[in-house]
Amino acid sequence: MEKNLSSRDDDALHSLSASSSYDSVYDLLHYHERGNGLTINGKPSYSIEDAGDQITRDNVSWNGSNVFGKSANLTFKFLQSARSTPDGDTGFVKFNAAQVAQAKLALQSWADLANITFTEVTGNQSANVTFGNYTRDSSGRLDYGTQAYAYLPGSGSASGTTWYNYNVDNIRSPDKMEYGRQTLTHEIGHALGLNHPGDYNAGEGNPTYREDTRQFSIMSYWSEKNTGGDFKGHYAAGPMLDDIDAIQRLYGANMTTRTGDTVYGFNSNTDRDFYTATSSSKALIFSVWDAGGKHTFDFSGYSNNQRINLNEGSLSDVGGLKGNVSIAHGVTIENAIGGSGNDLLIGNNADNILRGGAGDDILYGGGGADRLYGGSGRDTFVYTAVSDSKVAAPDWILDFQTGVDKIDLSALNTGNNLHFVNQFSGSGGEILLNWDSSASVSNLYLNLDNNTSPEFQVKIVGQVSQTADFVV
């Protein structure tokens, strides 16, 4: 699904500054555009697909070398003893209960994305992916310098093994410290065939491309702040936007994941902790993979000003963080619920339901027959093209407050000739506002062509004033 406005010659329109509300919509739709030959600060920008290729550049999986999109039934094991790690580290400690529980959650987060199954084995049975702790380096000294490491799939004895430094607090308590959970997900990524996005290790080296940060990949070592994000010291628990493309390149997309109607955020029914907000203090950092159904972003419990974009591949600012929520390619999220701040909600080409909630919100439905609720506060409903609300399938604005809310048509007034009329004359640039008293609905029509047939219609519950309620 293409981003609304992306194929239009809208840069010139943006320079005209149609309105501040339109500018807000434009800025979010063009937030972190990537690929297409862009170079930022001397680094090439990679598309999601190119980044996925880069992260899996060794082209290895548990199906062998250069085998792509093939499912795998894998086993995993929590080691009970080990003389040393493949790197020679010693002082083995088996996983504690918190580590076991968090490792299983991390495994599930990968299985949700791709055609991978994980079965636990014990005893003398071999496993594809194993887990163990160490405490001392190869010289026998207590090791406080490393966090963890893992090995790619293969036929060697080290292949798929993952190792964790038990001297590190977040490793011992990944249930209480976010970086410990992120480390588990990161190392499992290696054991499945994912590399770091660049040719570096343990913080040494430089990123290869612009999007090599934790905003886009849990396999990255670089802060999200390098690409304009801000997680306020929090860390992702599950794979991020580019990781989804990477793991699906190797094993294929899991098309059985969340095929029903799913809610992300508050009132979540995902059964995944990183998709679930239980209070306004919960920091959500996630990228959505979803195989079907009708889906909702519910960020109603936050009082921060939020920017929510439902287009695939997009980034949203949620709960006081920046660029912390994204949507994978091929995923359609139909609905969004804002909080009590001044939120910006942007739909996609599906039939969206957008609810602004309290605050002075801006709603842009984009294509499709959308149902829009501004909520309390002074809300603005933005339209940028006649295709945003067609006569055959119009938008509905369902809680418009006359004299308070606004309908912003300024982006359609490119020739400064948009004007209200009592009936269409056959000239372009005409707006007709019709009140249907029997249904208590105002019908807004636009005719931009030189004929008497409107190309655009919005249905508004309640009576609307052409002098008080429009930005033209």
From Swiss-Prot:
<keyword id="KW-0378">Hydrolase</keyword>
<dbReference type="GO" id="GO:0008270">
    <property type="term" value="F:zinc ion binding"/>
</dbReference>
<feature type="binding site">
    <location>
        <position position="395"/>
    </location>
    <ligand>
        <name>Ca(2+) 6</name>
    </ligand>
</feature>
<keyword id="KW-0645">Protease</keyword>
<feature type="binding site">
    <location>
        <position position="262"/>
    </location>
    <ligand>
        <name>Ca(2+) 1</name>
    </ligand>
</feature>
<dbReference type="InterPro" id="IPR034033">
    <property type="entry name" value="Serralysin-like"/>
</dbReference>
<feature type="binding site">
    <location>
        <position position="374"/>
    </location>
    <ligand>
        <name>Ca(2+) 5</name>
    </ligand>
</feature>
<dbReference type="Pfam" id="PF00353">
    <property type="entry name" value="HemolysinCabind"/>
</dbReference>
<feature type="binding site">
    <location>
        <position position="293"/>
    </location>
    <ligand>
        <name>Ca(2+) 2</name>
    </ligand>
</feature>
<feature type="binding site">
    <location>
        <position position="332"/>
    </location>
    <ligand>
        <name>Ca(2+) 2</name>
    </ligand>
</feature>
<feature type="binding site">
    <location>
        <position position="370"/>
    </location>
    <ligand>
        <name>Ca(2+) 6</name>
    </ligand>
</feature>
<dbReference type="GO" id="GO:0031012">
    <property type="term" value="C:extracellular matrix"/>
</dbReference>
<dbReference type="InterPro" id="IPR001818">
    <property type="entry name" value="Pept_M10_metallopeptidase"/>
</dbReference>
<feature type="binding site">
    <location>
        <position position="348"/>
    </location>
    <ligand>
        <name>Ca(2+) 4</name>
    </ligand>
</feature>
<keyword id="KW-0479">Metal-binding</keyword>
<feature type="repeat" description="Hemolysin-type calcium-binding 2">
    <location>
        <begin position="355"/>
        <end position="372"/>
    </location>
</feature>
<feature type="binding site">
    <location>
        <position position="357"/>
    </location>
    <ligand>
        <name>Ca(2+) 5</name>
    </ligand>
</feature>
<feature type="binding site">
    <location>
        <position position="388"/>
    </location>
    <ligand>
        <name>Ca(2+) 6</name>
    </ligand>
</feature>
<feature type="binding site">
    <location>
        <position position="379"/>
    </location>
    <ligand>
        <name>Ca(2+) 7</name>
    </ligand>
</feature>
<feature type="binding site">
    <location>
        <position position="221"/>
    </location>
    <ligand>
        <name>Zn(2+)</name>
    </ligand>
</feature>
<feature type="binding site">
    <location>
        <position position="405"/>
    </location>
    <ligand>
        <name>Ca(2+) 7</name>
    </ligand>
</feature>
<feature type="binding site">
    <location>
        <position position="379"/>
    </location>
    <ligand>
        <name>Ca(2+) 5</name>
    </ligand>
</feature>
<keyword id="KW-0862">Zinc</keyword>
<feature type="binding site">
    <location>
        <position position="334"/>
    </location>
    <ligand>
        <name>Ca(2+) 2</name>
    </ligand>
</feature>
<feature type="binding site">
    <location>
        <position position="365"/>
    </location>
    <ligand>
        <name>Ca(2+) 4</name>
    </ligand>
</feature>
<feature type="binding site">
    <location>
        <position position="341"/>
    </location>
    <ligand>
        <name>Ca(2+) 3</name>
    </ligand>
</feature>
<dbReference type="InterPro" id="IPR011049">
    <property type="entry name" value="Serralysin-like_metalloprot_C"/>
</dbReference>
<keyword id="KW-0106">Calcium</keyword>
<keyword id="KW-0865">Zymogen</keyword>
<dbReference type="GO" id="GO:0005615">
    <property type="term" value="C:extracellular space"/>
</dbReference>
<feature type="binding site">
    <location>
        <position position="190"/>
    </location>
    <ligand>
        <name>Zn(2+)</name>
    </ligand>
</feature>
<dbReference type="InterPro" id="IPR001343">
    <property type="entry name" value="Hemolysn_Ca-bd"/>
</dbReference>
<feature type="binding site">
    <location>
        <position position="352"/>
    </location>
    <ligand>
        <name>Ca(2+) 4</name>
    </ligand>
</feature>
<keyword id="KW-0964">Secreted</keyword>
<dbReference type="InterPro" id="IPR024079">
    <property type="entry name" value="MetalloPept_cat_dom_sf"/>
</dbReference>
<keyword id="KW-0677">Repeat</keyword>
<feature type="active site">
    <location>
        <position position="187"/>
    </location>
</feature>
<feature type="binding site">
    <location>
        <position position="366"/>
    </location>
    <ligand>
        <name>Ca(2+) 6</name>
    </ligand>
</feature>
<dbReference type="GO" id="GO:0004222">
    <property type="term" value="F:metalloendopeptidase activity"/>
</dbReference>
<feature type="binding site">
    <location>
        <position position="359"/>
    </location>
    <ligand>
        <name>Ca(2+) 5</name>
    </ligand>
</feature>
<dbReference type="InterPro" id="IPR016294">
    <property type="entry name" value="Pept_M10B"/>
</dbReference>
<dbReference type="Pfam" id="PF00413">
    <property type="entry name" value="Peptidase_M10"/>
</dbReference>
